[in-house]
């Protein structure tokens, strides 16, 4: 589903509408201008040989016409520091550190920030905590909820952690071989428990 949204997999039929407009025929660069994505692998979505400052600057200029006016200046550096400080991980003092030297959790936190620096139609979270240890995964999920709600974003998250789905999701979809087998929102979603989701999951996983 995510790859269809991003254009990596062509549609066999139907259409993809974003804000009521079809994006089926859009080129990849056109789609990504208003789509943010955080990948499962912390090594993706950032440039390991560039500093955090350089990575943030690239993300900040996404979809913009480049020119001398888009270089890093003190005002931008101060803004990046403020954004990083808001994450509460002490990253604001590591702007000159290369991304490859950061831990997986730190990289995912920066990747989340980078993915949401410019205006978005929606944010894709592609199992973005799956490669992290449990404690770090909890931290990244808390940050994700804070960023998504703080910026008023529409986000689509793929996860095998059913508790995360129930705790953070406003609408729950469960797919089995590309077919939606569960779709709950509103009061129905609020009444859904992790245990109930697990029962549905197990029902299809043994087929």
Locate each region found by the language model:
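Conserved ABC transporter NBD signature motif
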Residues: 11-22, 184
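Conserved beta-strand-loop-alpha-helix hinge in the C-terminal portion
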Residues: 179-203
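ABC ATPase NBD coupling module
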Residues: 22-36, 66, 73, 189-197
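ABC ATPase C-loop
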Residues: 115-116
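H-loop/switch region of ABC-family ATPase nucleotide-binding domains
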Residues: 159-160
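Catalytic Walker B motif of ABC-type/P-loop ATPase nucleotide-binding domains
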Residues: 123-126
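Q-loop/switch helix immediately C-terminal to the Walker
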Residues: 50-62
